[in-house]
């Protein structure tokens, strides 16, 4: 019986390990929110689901009796991979370590605690907190970035309070 590998994400830049796994005779399962994901054609089974939905991915992983889970070139999928891998006893990084690297607020706390230089920052739980801080304390411009987005996704530069919108 073929070993099963579940891949989190099937975007074009994620297809190389899918192709390799197929050549090595693995049963390839791909999960991607994009129903037309390029990786779909390289999979034995495809699930149209968000890779950030940890509980659903865990359910699928149990149902499929996977032997491994991979999040290739996806920061978003890395926490799901660690969560599922840890729950099922599969090779994986510790979830706490992955969360420290994936979430900017946790990473900055780690840097501060361990004596590293880190950028000045403030974490907000909601729009009102952010708005009040900027009105009372911040020197404009201010750069806002979600704690859980990778690269430049979700970055906003606030040059005046009119630019600040609730999202």
Model-identified regions with their sequence ranges:
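ATP-binding N-terminal substructure of ATP-dependent carboxylate-amine bond-forming enzymes
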Residues: 1-97, 128
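Active-site nucleotide/adenylate-binding loops and adjacent lid/helix of ATP-dependent enzymes
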Residues: 103-167
